[in-house]
Amino acid sequence: MNIHEYQGKEILRKYNVPVPRGIPAFSVDEALKAAEQLGGPVWVVKAQIHAGGRGKGGGVKVAKSMDEVKTYASNILGMQLVTHQTGPEGKKVNRLLIEEGADIKKELYVSLVVDRVSQKIALMASSEGGMDIEEVAAHTPEKIHTLIIEPSTGLTDADADDIARKIGVPDASVAQARQALQGLYKAFYETDASLAEINPLILTGDGKVIALDAKFNFDSNALFRHPEIVAYRDLDEEDANEIEASKFDLAYISLDGNIGCLVNGAGLAMATMDTIKLFGGEPANFLDVGGGATTEKVTEAFKLMLKNPNVQAILVNIFGGIMRCDVIAEGVISASKAVSLNVPLVVRMKGTNEELGRKMLADSGLPIISADTMEEAAQKVVAAAAGK
């Protein structure tokens, strides 16, 4: 689950990480009141969406008068903000963060993620923070320092000080940087985050260390023990189909292609999408019905896929281990009739009750295209989507 910048800063504040004073605003009037409450002479008007790259996309503006606050708030609120993380369709801006300006002397970068290789927590930091951190990672990776943290030990004073010095924090500000780094680590660990990022972490002209931005992503599997995090959820930022899918315990992610995919198991789902692309097709979604799919779940899965007007064909790829092929066949038949299926449907089933499932499909009278291997299924669905 993602949250907005201003919500991330609320979390950082609780963990004693210095952040600028700021007030969220949902209208131009609220933006002006926020600016007045903060006082001048400089404010930053920041679009709040669940995506990075807002500055380059025109979603962050520095205002030096109340008139500029009004102009920028009017322009940004309601705009369709396009960044490298939103896709070409962009995201609509429904809320702003009005923040006091800061005297930026140096921009740094720091983030925490779960490192799957070491099965520990990785802290990454760089002296080159700001809007071009992706370029730094791509072209000068030596400027990014990584520290693997043992969770039972945490981020020690010595390690925090060492990282701070490596990214160019002067001795006079190292203690402040240590406080910020350890606060970020504690926030990451105690909230079950999967990502915590400050970009930039700034040094001001008078030597202060301040988190000028905050990005958090949380492990959805741990949200049951964090109602305070769930309260931050903004459904307007989420795909409506993905929200609907979660109600039926379906793992669904919208994509840009024209071939709907219904698969059991995340690994098989990814392999299926790769195979579709191998034969020149483009998946319209990732959809994992899991190991306990019912007829109802399969029907809802079909409804979700067909809500996408770009879908020209559907591939059902099932490995019947825990999931029986006859149950999937029953669901496919029921779903096809319930949604009045009007696009080609390719079905490939292997495993438990495979022959029974195939017979049920063959006897259904529905125009279902059968396939024996994943490669054959991918080739057939790509051809069907192309009208061949």
From Swiss-Prot:
Q: Which residues cross the membrane?
A: none
| Any GO MF annotation of the entry | ATP binding
Listed under catalytic activity are: succinate + ATP + CoA = succinyl-CoA + ADP + phosphate; GTP + succinate + CoA = succinyl-CoA + GDP + phosphate
- For this protein, the Enzyme Commission number is 6.2.1.5
Residues the record lists as binding Mg(2+) = N199, D213
Q: Which residues form the ATP-grasp domain?
A: 9-244
* Cofactor annotation: Mg(2+)
Q: What class of enzyme is it?
A: ligase
Describe the family membership recorded for this protein in Swiss-Prot or TrEMBL: Belongs to the succinate/malate CoA ligase beta subunit family.
The protein's matches in HAMAP family, at most eight in alphabetical order, are given as: Succ_CoA_beta
PANTHER family attached here?
A: SUCCINATE--COA LIGASE [GDP-FORMING] SUBUNIT BETA, MITOCHONDRIAL, SUCCINYL-COA SYNTHETASE BETA CHAIN
- The name this protein goes by in its record: Succinate--CoA ligase [ADP-forming] subunit beta
State the organism named in the record.
Cupriavidus taiwanensis (strain DSM 17343 / BCRC 17206 / CCUG 44338 / CIP 107171 / LMG 19424 / R1)
